[in-house]
Amino acid sequence: MKYQQLENLECGWKWTYLMKKHQEGELITKYIENSAAHAAVDKLIELESEPVRVLKWIEQHMNPDLSNRMKQTIRARRKRHFNAEHQHTRKKSIDLDFPVWHRLSALSQRRGNTLSETIIQLIEDAERKEKYANQMSSLKHDLEAILGKKE
């Protein structure tokens, strides 16, 4: 396993995931009968401050259809959590207008790179171009100074 599982933290994430799904109107319990489902959800709400007991609730009451989706969500959240600890693995998001994103995406695909790699290449290209322009300007200035002195 690449990332360490932290039971307390992940139980809290699972509780949050289940509550969010419940608020969105999804059936989070395996019960068809409304009263049993409401009782199970009420019990889950009480477990907010006891994250480890959430696992037992999941075993007893959770809708089995949610199992894989919840595992994937928790796995992704665990990855983001541990990646956020190190500067080089921390992810940031930026807002792009759709046409800009579309052009960047097409360029990335042509180059066979990720969006991040393509952005880095574009920045490096711009920096090299700027450095070259500065060198040419300096050479031009020096040449004008040399030619200007001889006259």
Swiss-Prot record:
Q: Kindly report the protein's main subcellular placement as a broad class.
A: cytoplasm
Q: Does the keyword Cell division apply?
A: yes
- The answer to whether keyword Methyltransferase applies is no
This protein's GO CC annotations? cytoplasm
Q: Which InterPro entries match?
A: Arc_rbn_hlx_hlx (IPR013321), MatP (IPR009390), MatP_C (IPR035375), MatP_N (IPR035087), MatP_N_sf (IPR038339)
Return one Gene Ontology term, BP aspect. Answer: cell division
Against Gene3D superfamilies, the record matches this protein to: MatP, N-terminal domain, Met repressor-like
Determine the domain of life of the protein's source.
Bacteria
Recorded hits in Pfam families, A to Z, give: MatP (PF06303), MatP_C (PF17414)
Localization, per the record, is: Cytoplasm
Function noted in UniProt:
Required for spatial organization of the terminus region of the chromosome (Ter macrodomain) during the cell cycle. Prevents early segregation of duplicated Ter macrodomains during cell division. Binds specifically to matS, which is a 13 bp signature motif repeated within the Ter macrodomain.
**Matches recorded under HAMAP family:** MatP (MF_01073)
| Family note | Belongs to the MatP family.
This protein's name:
Macrodomain Ter protein
Species: Photorhabdus laumondii subsp. laumondii (strain DSM 15139 / CIP 105565 / TT01) (Photorhabdus luminescens subsp. laumondii)
Q: What is the lineage of its organism?
A: Bacteria, Pseudomonadati, Pseudomonadota, Gammaproteobacteria, Enterobacterales
Gene name of this polypeptide: matP
